[in-house]
Regions:
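Bacterial N-terminal signal peptides
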Residues: 9-18
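Lumenal/extracellular ectodomains and adaptor appendage modules
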Residues: 22-391
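Bacterial N-terminal signal peptides that target proteins for export
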Residues: 1-9
Length: 391
């Protein structure tokens, strides 16, 4: 069957004036990541549906702010992309296909917004503003979520397999895997040791034992193990999670003068609290039922996050940064076409640019990936329209 492959990246750079010049300021953030959008994908292999044409419309009537004071202010932003597909079923039988449309993570400037009444950062959901239609009528659509590092491009080979129905099966991180949470108190470090560092060494079989220290700053490879370390001071509480079998020699702490971990100093690190849970309990510690994220998508993202933190380290070490946990959103919906039938499928999604404030005026970059077109049996005409006053 004929296949037309489109693998280009369509990038729109919009400036708020014709002439730009670089600007620099010390100790100030100058770049905020946006999100990449992409086209509709078919989940089913060997699907006979073809795309006769696509109308891709970018509506950029305003630029987003790099900081929002409220959720309402962020949700008032109007940037969007609309993909209108004309699908046709050339087969002599009815085809029901499940489609997904990935539309990126929330941007840096909108993922979490400070809520002054609660003194907390609130996760934002913007998906109710958008949706999917067939022949002009809204249809049921699920919003799915998968782990995706900010600033990384969409990859069919890497991102599609993460979109799993139900709970993922993993060789190590199983729902019933035992997890111990241990909390240690730090005492007796002299005031002169401003760069005091706590550390312990792991020499475990990572297929049986893995260890995560929440407050760590670094991991160093030793001849026969790894050393996990982090800055500390008197009064600190250190939290360690042990997955699977406990380390053969437990967690044995040492205190050092600084991060080089050469000269030991006086002080005590004492176990004050220990509790056993399951990995499922661990995975859902911060799950919010009102977030719109399904339990299975959240769990699968946690498994992927922990595996990403384990893959570069031997001897049972896990290195993760809580701030690096970010989710990409997908629309998932079903189309049914009778033999020879043609229909119009319209998908509208938010459009968030990357912002580079290192120039005056700032540069806003909108990226839309066309490579998913290669998942279709045939892809015909593509028309791109940009509606904006900034040209």
């Amino acid at each position: 069957m004929k296949r037309k492959v489109i693998t280009v990246i369509f990038t729109v750079l919009l400036l708020s004036a014709v002439f730009i010049q670089p600007t620099h300021a010390n100790s100030a953030q100058r770049h905020w990541s946006g999100t990449d959008s992409t086209g509709a994908l078919v989940k089913d292999k060997n699907c006979p549906l073809v795309v006769d044409k696509e109308l891709l419309t970018f509506d950029v009537q305003e630029f987003p702010k790099n900081y929002y004071n409220s959720i309402e202010e962020f949700l008032a932003y109007t940037g969007k992309v609309t993909a209108e597909y004309t699908f046709r079923n050339p087969a002599d039988y009815t085809v029901t296909a499940t489609l997904v449309f990935p539309f990126g993570n929330l941007p840096h400037y909108g993922e979490y917004i400070y809520d002054s009444p609660t003194d907390k950062y609130i996760a934002v959901s913007d998906t109710e503003k958008y949706g999917v239609k067939v022949n002009g009528e809204p249809i049921d659509v699920a919003v799915r979520h998968t782990l995706k590092a900010r600033g990384t491009p969409f990859s069919l080979d890497e991102d599609m397999p993460k979109l799993t129905d139900g709970y993922i099966s993993d060789s190590f991180f199983r729902p019933d895997l035992p997890v111990w949470v241990q909390q240690y108190s730090v005492e007796g470090i002299g005031a002169e040791n401003q760069a005091a560092t706590a550390a312990f060494v792991l020499r475990e079989d990572s297929s049986k034992t893995r260890v995560l220290w929440a407050e760590k700053n670094g991991i160093a490879t030793l001849k026969d193990g790894i050393r996990i370390s982090g800055w500390t001071k008197t009064g600190d509480t250190l939290t360690v999670y042990i997955f699977g079998e406990p380390p053969k020699d437990g967690i044995t702490w040492s205190l050092y003068e600084n991060g080089a971990c050469k000269k030991k100093i006086d002080g005590n690190i004492t176990l004050k609290y220990s509790e056993q849970m399951t990995f499922r309990d661990f995975a859902f510690r911060e799950y919010d039922n009102s977030s719109g994220i399904s339990e299975s998508d959240w769990y699968n993202a946690q498994v992927a996050f922990m595996n990403d933190g384990s893959k570069d380290w031997m001897y049972g070490g896990i290195y993760t940064e809580k701030s690096a946990f970010s989710l990409m959103r997908w629309y998932e919906y079903t189309l049914t076409l009778e033999p020879g039938q043609t229909l119009t499928n319209t998908v509208t999604a938010p459009l968030y640019p990357a912002i580079d404030a290192g120039y005056t005026p700032s540069i806003h970059t909108y990226t839309y990936l066309l490579s998913p077109a290669k998942t279709w049996a045939q892809f015909g005409e593509l028309k791109i329209v940009v509606n904006t006053p900034y040209y």
